[in-house]
Amino acid sequence: MLGAETIVAIATPPGRAGIGMVRVSGPDARAIVSRFVTSIAWQPWQAHLAKLLDQQGHEIDQVIVTFFERPRSYTAEDLVEITCHGSPVVLRHAVERALEAGARLARPGEFTLRAFLNGRIDLPRAEAVRDLIDATTLYQARIAAQQVEGSVSRRIAPLKEQLLELIALLEAGIDFAEDDISVAPPAEILRRLSPVLEGTERLAASFQYGGLVHQGLTLAIVGRPNVGKSSLFNRLLEQDRAIVTEIPGTTRDVVSETAAIGGIPVKLYDTAGIRETEERVESLGIERSYQAIVDSDLALVVLDLTRPVTAEDASLIARAGARALIVANKCDLPAAGDVPAEAIPVSALTGQGVPELRSAILDAVAPKGVLEHETGFITSLRHEQLLREAVEYLQKAREAVASIPHEMLLLDLYAALRPIDAITGATTADDILNRIFSTFCIGK
């Protein structure tokens, strides 16, 4: 399904830069670019030095033109990339000349949409392109790159193939029903259905960890005044973001910032010290501290090892419940007491124990090693929801194998096939595709 129109867009971020790129894709890409660059050989997949011209034929810039001949291009169409100096004026001029020559401005994500529609990539790979662009940590980029190479698609394909084989078996059983030949007894159906169901369930369940890669964690740092919450906040961020003083109540409101812990984006919340107070502004800050515990995935309850554990400390730990990680700060000081059971000793001042704290944060949300070594999990909420839908129909089919005719069983199996196909884009509605690709940047 090659695009009938030729599209153009700037493919590099806005603003001044050393270089910039304009992309042109479609049946007339080569002819359109020929209108505003000097003559080149147009050898496919080779870089050609040329000059970008204005309407009067004056040189605007010296550029590199690369022609990718269909179908061996990103979009599977004729594609031309013009690399020039990254002046916004020069880039806009190249786009304007392409528009004058018959191209139209590309919509967000339209280059990747064409790659999908033309069979160059499937939908999970297209979505992974967006995730790679949006990656804020190297770990996110690594997982997205694996998905661009097909890690999700490779796990979906055998499930679909096994399901289609079972459907074909049942369809054949219906064809031979008049001859009293049973080609698909219940035991055989269950033998074939069980691995499909179990594989789909495992893949859906992998979102529990894969979702962390994409969505990240929220983590509240809470405790009494002057236990070192802001110092720990700064230490985890590896920058001085929060104000640190010896005056109790310095932090009056929740301060948030994002850090990378083990490659996972973690939204950190530094909160007001929790204590009894009649001061109105501080009281509001303390209320927000309590709310931060409720809203966060984890709560670091910070204790001061130079002071005894109090009822307020115990109350905070109880309030955080299973989400609590107890941090015993100031372990470097001579006055530090014994570390409470289950607490992680750290020094926010020197960094002692902070690597162990980072590991404990990751271990609290995923089994040790899962995030480091697992690469086949899904990171898309859309994929997880569709897999859960498929699981529902597969479970219905398994429960009814021995009690309903094959025709009825097939209804559930076909119903399970639809969401699986929707993941890969085989049967995805246009409005869903538009919603997905509208989240891409223009030029990609």
From Swiss-Prot:
GO biological process, alphabetically ordered: tRNA methylation; tRNA wobble uridine modification
* CDD domains (alphabetical): trmE, TrmE_N
In the UniProt record, does the keyword Methyltransferase occur? no
Which Enzyme Commission number(s) are on file for it? 3.6.-.-
Which residues are noted in the entry as GTP-binding? Answer: 226-231, 245-251, 270-273
Query: Origin, by domain of life?
Result: Bacteria
GO terms for MF: GTP binding; GTPase activity; metal ion binding
Name under which the protein is recorded: tRNA modification GTPase MnmE
Report the protein's function.
Exhibits a very high intrinsic GTPase hydrolysis rate. Involved in the addition of a carboxymethylaminomethyl (cmnm) group at the wobble position (U34) of certain tRNAs, forming tRNA-cmnm(5)s(2)U34.
What does the record say about how the cofactor binds? Binds 1 potassium ion per subunit.
Q: Which cofactor does it need?
A: K(+)
Q: Could you say which residues bind Mg(2+) here?
A: S230, T251
Q: Which Gene3D superfamilies match?
A: P-loop containing nucleotide triphosphate hydrolases, Probable tRNA modification gtpase trme, domain 1, tRNA modification GTPase MnmE domain 2
Q: Which residues bind (6S)-5-formyl-5,6,7,8-tetrahydrofolate?
A: R23, E81, R120, K444
What are the GO cellular component annotations? cytosol
Matches recorded under InterPro entries: G_TrmE, GTP-bd, GTP-bd_TrmE_N, GTPase_MnmE, MnmE_dom2, MnmE_helical, P-loop_NTPase, Small_GTP-bd
Primary enzyme class:
hydrolase
What organism is the protein native to? Solibacter usitatus (strain Ellin6076)
Where, in this chain's numbering, is K(+) bound? N226, T245, I247, T250
Locations listed in the record: Cytoplasm
Key words, A-Z: Cytoplasm, GTP-binding, Hydrolase, Magnesium, Metal-binding, Nucleotide-binding, Potassium, tRNA processing
Q: Where does the record place the TrmE-type G domain? A: 216-366
